[in-house]
């Protein structure tokens, strides 16, 4: 415990949800009693929690003012959360009718949709969710909104730990999650949001431990690459 009791801001898109303590490796009650944690337990599991929701939460707790009054450690997590805090965040609203129609298409059909309507594919690893969002962005390109960057200091310092044993750490964390009752936690979720259903550990029927490990390895590598390219750190 640091004598200055520096608050910790979670950038984890799953830790925002109540009831996902094991899945998101949320700090224990003892840890939360010692240090103030922000960005956790702020949404119900049936809520589709977006980046805009996260930014509105930060404004609700007067986070910009806090950053001038004290040091804050941001940990994790979702690179887009961090980027949206310090830059203008551009987003397009979704159209429920368009989304419902696109969700009926499979991966191959979505790729064909891009080809037929000459929609440029995103330069990221493709999956059904990203293809749908890319089509929506193209169809709704005139409906772009900008969430202004938060008024927070620009002298941010990034700490990157090039841990050669990160895969071993992931394996241990996964094993601990399963032993601590991950399956029971997930079974108790009532009508989980689409955001949660996309999380690592969800919708896995067999060999859950191996699946979580493999997806976590990929995510960890992606996060390291993303944050090292962030020019504000």
Regions found by a protein language model. Give the residues of each.
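Phosphate/pyrophosphate-binding catalytic cores of soluble transferases and nucleic-acid-acting enzymes
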Residues: 1-233
């Amino acid at each position: 415990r640091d004598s200055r009791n520096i608050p910790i801001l979670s950038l984890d898109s799953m830790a925002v949800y109540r009831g996902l303590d094991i899945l998101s490796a949320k700090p224990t009650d003892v840890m939360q009693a010692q240090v103030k944690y922000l960005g956790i337990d702020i949404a119900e599991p049936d809520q589709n929690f977006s980046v805009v929701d996260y930014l509105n939460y930060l404004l609700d707790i007067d986070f910009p003012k806090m950053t001038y009054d004290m040091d804050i450690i941001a940990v994790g997590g979702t690179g887009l959360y961090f980027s949206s805090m310090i830059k203008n965040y551009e987003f397009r609203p979704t159209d429920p009718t368009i989304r419902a129609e696109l969700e009926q298409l499979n991966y191959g059909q979505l790729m064909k949709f891009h080809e037929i309507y000459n929609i440029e594919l995103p330069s990221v690893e493709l999956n059904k969710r990203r293809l749908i969002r890319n089509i929506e962005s193209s169809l709704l390109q005139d409906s772009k909104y900008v969430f202004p960057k938060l008024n927070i200091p620009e002298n941010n310092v990034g700490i990157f730990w090039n841990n050669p044993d990160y895969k071993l750490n992931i394996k241990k964390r996964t094993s601990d999650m399963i032993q601590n009752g991950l399956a029971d936690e997930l079974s108790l979720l009532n009508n989980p949001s689409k955001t949660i259903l996309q999380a690592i550990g969800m919708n896995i029927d067999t060999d859950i431990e191996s699946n979580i490990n493999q997806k976590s390895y990929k995510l960890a590598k992606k996060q390291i690459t993303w944050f090292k390219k962030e020019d504000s750190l």
